[in-house]
């Protein structure tokens, strides 16, 4: 595995005539990231991973400074997973002038974007920069961040970016808790209680399967999540996927998405329901 940190080093490490699978991350790798690498490894000649904690997607009162970082650990995991090129740039490398940024016009003011203004502008700005640098054949994103995946797919279509976006399933603990770098902030008791999030989402999906109306499913989902102690609901939403718009009679896929705030960790999770 080759570790590079500058644009020049990255460009010299990229192959000219082979397919590239790209896995962008913010580090503190876990099994969810490893599953993305596994998919990339299976479908491409070369696998490139980036590790960069992107400052422009954090708000002024968010956890940028305390976001978990352990490059030595990440390097070991990336190497063991079969990553060929690990790109580990500085903020100065990724934002040399910070003259221009991507602005998201639709879908960024709902779900996570409702309480994190500017977040997805930062996400798509860094994704745009990384796509320009790596020029991957395929890029791999986990559906735990389903809103992010939908917006990246829209960006790729709008800007005619020649990359295939691969949606990858959520990797979970045995309890159902979605794997996340922020799980490290949970206490032992909170870790147990947080597993109830997926249980509530699963029951909501089953209610849709049984033909219950969207409003009633949402009401029941809120009730179940409200029962989780020492937590606060940030949002509970059912939206059309991948448009992220209101559910209509034409909707064939629905995203059931939630965000729950514990003392030191804000967790997101979701399930996708398909009609028929």
From Swiss-Prot:
Q: What compartments host this protein? A: Cytoplasm
Q: Where does (R)-pantoate bind?
A: 57, 148
Binding-site residues, beta-alanine: 57
- Which reaction is this enzyme known to catalyze? (R)-pantoate + beta-alanine + ATP = (R)-pantothenate + AMP + diphosphate + H(+)
A GO MF annotation of the entry reads: ATP binding
Its domain of life?
Bacteria
Active site positions: 33 (proton donor)
What UniProt keywords are attached to this protein's entry? ATP-binding, Cytoplasm, Ligase, Nucleotide-binding, Pantothenate biosynthesis
The EC number on file is: 6.3.2.1
- Binding-site residues for ATP, renumbered to this chain: 26-33, 142-145, 171, 179-182
What Pfam families does this protein map onto?
Answer: Pantoate_ligase (PF02569)
Q: Which pathway is this protein assigned to?
A: Cofactor biosynthesis; (R)-pantothenate biosynthesis; (R)-pantothenate from (R)-pantoate and beta-alanine: step 1/1
GO CC entries: cytosol
An example GO biological process term is: pantothenate biosynthetic process
User: What other comment is given for this protein?
Assistant: The reaction proceeds by a bi uni uni bi ping pong mechanism.
**Which protein family is it in?**
Belongs to the pantothenate synthetase family.
Per the entry, what this protein does is: Catalyzes the condensation of pantoate with beta-alanine in an ATP-dependent reaction via a pantoyl-adenylate intermediate.
Q: Which PANTHER family does this one have?
A: CYTIDYLATE KINASE/PANTOATE-BETA-ALANINE LIGASE, PANTOATE--BETA-ALANINE LIGASE
Per UniProt, subunit arrangement is: Homodimer.
**What's the protein name?**
Pantothenate synthetase
């Amino acid at each position: 595995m080759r570790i590079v940190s500058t644009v020049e080093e990255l460009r010299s490490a990229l192959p000219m005539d082979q397919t590239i699978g790209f896995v962008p991350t913010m580090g503190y790798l876990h099994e969810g990231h490893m599953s993305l690498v596994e998919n990339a490894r299976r479908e491409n000649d070369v696998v490139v991973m980036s590790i960069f904690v992107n400052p422009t997607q954090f708000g002024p009162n968010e956890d940028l400074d305390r976001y978990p970082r352990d490059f030595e650990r990440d390097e070991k995991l990336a190497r063991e997973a079969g990553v060929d090129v690990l790109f580990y740039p500085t903020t100065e490398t990724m934002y040399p002038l910070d003259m221009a940024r991507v602005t998201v016009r639709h879908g960024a003011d709902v779900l996570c974007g409702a309480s994190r203004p500017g977040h997805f502008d930062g996400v798509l700005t860094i994704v745009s920069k990384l796509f320009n640098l790596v020029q991957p054949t395929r890029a791999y994103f986990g559906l735990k961040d389903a809103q992010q995946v939908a917006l990246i797919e829209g960006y790729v279509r709008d800007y005619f970016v020649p990359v295939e976006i691969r949606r990858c399933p959520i990797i979970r603990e045995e309890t159902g808790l979605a794997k996340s770098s922020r799980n490290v902030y949970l206490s032992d008791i909170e870790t147990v209680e947080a597993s109830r999030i997926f249980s509530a989402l699963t029951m909501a999906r089953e209610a849709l399967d049984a033909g219950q109306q969207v409003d009633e499913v949402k009401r029941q989902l809120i009730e179940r999540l409200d029962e989780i102690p020492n937590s606060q609901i940030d949002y509970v939403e059912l939206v059309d996927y991948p448009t992220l718009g209101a559910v209509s009679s034409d909707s064939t896929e629905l995203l059931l998405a939630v965000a729950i705030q514990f003392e030191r960790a804000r967790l997101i999770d979701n399930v996708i329901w398909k009609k028929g």
